Amino acid sequence: MRIAALLCFALLAANMAAAADITVLSGGAIEPGLRAAVAAFEKQSGHAVRVTFNTAPQIQKRVEGGDKFDIVIAPPAVIDPLQKLGAIAAGGPSVGRVGLGVAVREGAAPPDIATTDALRKTVLDADAIVFNRASTGQYFEGLLKRLDLWTAVEGKATRYADGASVLDHVKNGKGRDIAFAAITEILLYKDKGIRFVGPLPADVQNFTSYTASLTPQGSGSAAARELAAFFATAQSKQLFTAAGVE
């Protein structure tokens, strides 16, 4: 019995030694898909993954400031300059892309966004247009300028650092407040007082793509390399797709 107990203890110790903690810094728009993929990876590998979510500008600032993570998942606007600095490795797998959607509070009449002309009228008629200061919001502000709407609506534009704050604002609003946010973030609020109206019209839609890149710290970790490789598998892609990440 004593020998059997010692063998069990030795096996347990070996498994604990083999397991590793992996740290990931990621954009928040892919949170639903990433959490599902990470859960599957943890179950299969025995490794523990700790994920921190930030906006794209915050990710760049943190990595450039010396914060240490094994894997960074972000849009090209962040990945490219960090690669040039040598802060992350090139050639990481794409985890998918996220489109821009429109939302109102539950119970509010859904605005017409079927066409770009309809979207234009909806924006002009809104009491407030609410969007973030991250990748999604940067694109949307640029779109309003291209549609010659920015001057007319700038005064009723409300900006937040992240998508959650955008949706909380609209959820708690009373007028014709409209949120423009990543579709994945909107879907997280579908049972929390937010109604998903739909994606932007195809001719003005924008997809933000996300790439998983190893840092120098992560490149030296077999477990981190294993997770990066997992993101390229069909299983991972299916989990991201099911969560709205194309």
Region spans (language model):
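Bacterial N-terminal signal peptides
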Residues: 4-15
